[in-house]
């Protein structure tokens, strides 16, 4: 992926303001609420019976933080996203059997959550850079699938 200096600036400046626990937990919770079939990957997380239960599920929130912390590695390694996510791609493909389309869904939800948390900073140009990033991460995570 080729990044312009402006795109890198949009991504890194917004990322510096992100509360990984809050945004990550909210993004994963929204994924599970809006796309309930994704809940099958999180059966061990306990009560996912309602939106309220999901939004307050400690395991969902903790895993959301873990996911977004990992996503932060993409921000730090914009020029080598494929290598950054090679092991996670293999894990999600070989062991967890996650449908790679779910990575795109989560990326789209992350864009929405960022826009709601940072309405002033999330300009059309910023959104374009972030969309490019979440698509690059989703693609890198899908590479382990044959």
Curated annotation (Swiss-Prot):
<dbReference type="GO" id="GO:0020037">
    <property type="term" value="F:heme binding"/>
</dbReference>
<dbReference type="InterPro" id="IPR009050">
    <property type="entry name" value="Globin-like_sf"/>
</dbReference>
<dbReference type="GO" id="GO:0005344">
    <property type="term" value="F:oxygen carrier activity"/>
</dbReference>
<keyword id="KW-0561">Oxygen transport</keyword>
<dbReference type="GO" id="GO:0072562">
    <property type="term" value="C:blood microparticle"/>
</dbReference>
<dbReference type="GO" id="GO:0046872">
    <property type="term" value="F:metal ion binding"/>
</dbReference>
<feature type="binding site" description="proximal binding residue">
    <location>
        <position position="92"/>
    </location>
    <ligand>
        <name>heme b</name>
    </ligand>
</feature>
<dbReference type="GO" id="GO:0043177">
    <property type="term" value="F:organic acid binding"/>
</dbReference>
<keyword id="KW-0408">Iron</keyword>
<dbReference type="GO" id="GO:0019825">
    <property type="term" value="F:oxygen binding"/>
</dbReference>
<feature type="domain" description="Globin">
    <location>
        <begin position="2"/>
        <end position="146"/>
    </location>
</feature>
<dbReference type="InterPro" id="IPR002337">
    <property type="entry name" value="Hemoglobin_b"/>
</dbReference>
<dbReference type="GO" id="GO:0031838">
    <property type="term" value="C:haptoglobin-hemoglobin complex"/>
</dbReference>
<dbReference type="Pfam" id="PF00042">
    <property type="entry name" value="Globin"/>
</dbReference>
<keyword id="KW-0349">Heme</keyword>
<dbReference type="GO" id="GO:0005833">
    <property type="term" value="C:hemoglobin complex"/>
</dbReference>
<dbReference type="InterPro" id="IPR000971">
    <property type="entry name" value="Globin"/>
</dbReference>
<keyword id="KW-0813">Transport</keyword>
<comment type="subunit">
    <text>Hemoglobins A and D are heterotetramers of alpha-1, alpha-2 and two identical beta chains.</text>
</comment>
<dbReference type="GO" id="GO:0004601">
    <property type="term" value="F:peroxidase activity"/>
</dbReference>
<dbReference type="GO" id="GO:0031720">
    <property type="term" value="F:haptoglobin binding"/>
</dbReference>
<comment type="similarity">
    <text>Belongs to the globin family.</text>
</comment>
<protein>
    <recommendedName>
        <fullName>Hemoglobin A/D subunit beta</fullName>
    </recommendedName>
</protein>
<comment type="function">
    <text>Involved in oxygen transport from the lung to the various peripheral tissues.</text>
</comment>
<feature type="binding site" description="distal binding residue">
    <location>
        <position position="63"/>
    </location>
    <ligand>
        <name>heme b</name>
    </ligand>
</feature>
<keyword id="KW-0479">Metal-binding</keyword>
<dbReference type="GO" id="GO:0042744">
    <property type="term" value="P:hydrogen peroxide catabolic process"/>
</dbReference>
<dbReference type="InterPro" id="IPR012292">
    <property type="entry name" value="Globin/Proto"/>
</dbReference>
<dbReference type="InterPro" id="IPR050056">
    <property type="entry name" value="Hemoglobin_oxygen_transport"/>
</dbReference>
């Amino acid at each position: 992926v080729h990044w312009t200096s402006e795109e890198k600036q949009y991504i890194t400046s917004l990322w510096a303001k992100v509360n990984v626990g809050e945004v990550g937990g909210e993004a994963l919770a929204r994924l599970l609420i809006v796309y309930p079939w994704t809940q099958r990957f999180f059966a061990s997380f306990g009560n996912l019976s309602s939106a309220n239960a999901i939004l307050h599920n400690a395991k969902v929130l903790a895993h959301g933080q873990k996911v977004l912390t990992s996503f932060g590695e993409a921000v730090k390694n914009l020029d080598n996203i494929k290598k950054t996510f090679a092991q996670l791609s293999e894990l999600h493909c070989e062991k967890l059997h996650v449908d790679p389309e779910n990575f795109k869904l989560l990326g789209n939800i992350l864009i929405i959550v960022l826009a709601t948390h940072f309405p002033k900073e999330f300009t059309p140009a910023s959104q374009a850079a972030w969309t490019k990033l979440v698509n690059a991460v989703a693609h890198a995570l899908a590479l382990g699938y044959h």
